[in-house]
């Protein structure tokens, strides 16, 4: 089902009244063809002719969008499954994901074709027919064997006492494990050299399924190999090794593609590649650790705190993007530096006008940190009222989030220098019970405008537009560039975070709860937020000597006991002090002497707590045995997540 309709259509309405509207859904492919030169040398009539090409979305465009939507849907399925009330159900996550990748009527591998088409258009390269054919044949063969395994797993669950069912199932499992190894070799740098980036999302999906299959060996292994005590352990070691191998492969090739765009100075392409590979590769591999059924034997409430950025509105206009200024300048103008996780609370906008053109000339975000009632104001970007104009505010109601939006900006008509700034924004806001629209409007109806929609703002399955009770991302920040080409030309980008993030840091009653430490409510001392490596699902907190942070939590159920566990890495011996607070005083304390992990993440088992209050704080402080000065310039304690494991 194609859910974008003709929102990609450019409609020119009633030229006699000089009122026109253009619709601009993106990402616009291919990446390797920036349109600055085209726009600078195209007159109005020619530009309208260019727009005619986007009148109806063709099958290729539909396939490309479906490939992106599949990545969105699979991540949401994983998050939803692990957060469900029963994890060892009769279907299983392996079955659910395989059904998404191989729908019942998909005999032509259309889903996998969509995934390949998406990456082809993303990086403007093509997979040869030979390479594509090899991959499709391998996937078709794998489909039959996956279906066979799923069928025998169901038969065994329906009749677990049947030794015949069990024997056949174990044989199917062993063969399928080998088949996955073969499929990986078909799409990796050995089987398809030179096509590693083009096949990377395919590789990630195959790797994901393989690890879920190996997870089955941990869930059912004590019954499958009751007479072979070491079989389950052997497959566990294989799962650990494959998790490392698959993660490193995806990160290495993702970074290579990213660096190719960075080296070429193509920030627009760099940002789009980063966003869409996050949605189709990095989000998936960030789930791999929770497939470890020994570390995570029950349901897991998990979150993705990474931030993605839209294409830049007006990014094709000269003066607002590279090569007019440096790659680093573009990154600072249109994205945020690493930061504690924030919740958008509203905006202050400044509206100005030049002649008959009225537009958004500057703005400021209002936000808060998790479980922190203080409202912070971001830096003002663009032109404030010092340049004239009026100020207005938009406030997002408490416990509400922007799940969709669209914008309108004045159309660029070469060679005139009229403003191309935003004139209208429509924010769709949800409290998860209903929706309301908050509108910024400076629009004059007698001027031609371009409408921009954000195609990655879908429902959780990635198959339809976002709805107030079913959405994948929420707006977290707006960035305005009003400094590189004067008041008539502004560039705008929007930041979004995943809808899995819990605004209250709620500790589930009967699930393992993972909460990224970047969701601290406050930090102090020599502490910084570091860009995540790509496989953690978000940024990390780096603590130096004599630094500390506070995290506030909400207990779903009182009088529950939990083991507290921290995922961290450290290249130097340090001391971590954890305290649980009640009011102004702490009621529990645990001091840990931490040894170096030499670059790898490890788990620290801390104290056991009881949820005696609905809301409580935990603090973390770091000291070093040789003092601040000695370790000031070396890597420090890096924290990823804090976890709460029900003791029962």
UniProtKB/Swiss-Prot annotation:
One GO term of the biological process aspect: sporulation resulting in formation of a cellular spore
Gene3D superfamilies assigned to the protein according to its UniProt record, in alphabetical order: Galactose-binding domain-like (2.60.120.260), Pesticidal crystal protein, central domain (2.100.10.10), Pesticidal crystal protein, N-terminal domain (1.20.190.10)
GO molecular function: signaling receptor binding; toxin activity
Superkingdom of origin: Bacteria
Keyword annotations of the record: Sporulation, Toxin, Virulence
One Pfam family from the record: Endotoxin_C
CDD domains cross-referenced by the UniProt entry: delta_endotoxin_C
Known role: Promotes colloidosmotic lysis by binding to the midgut epithelial cells of mosquitos.
Miscellaneous remark of the record: Toxic segment of the protein is located in the N-terminus.
Entry similarity comment: Belongs to the delta endotoxin family.
This protein's name: Pesticidal crystal protein Cry19Aa
Naturally occurring in which organism (per UniProt): Bacillus thuringiensis subsp. jegathesan
Organism ancestry: Bacteria, Bacillati, Bacillota, Bacilli, Bacillales
Designated gene of the protein: cry19Aa
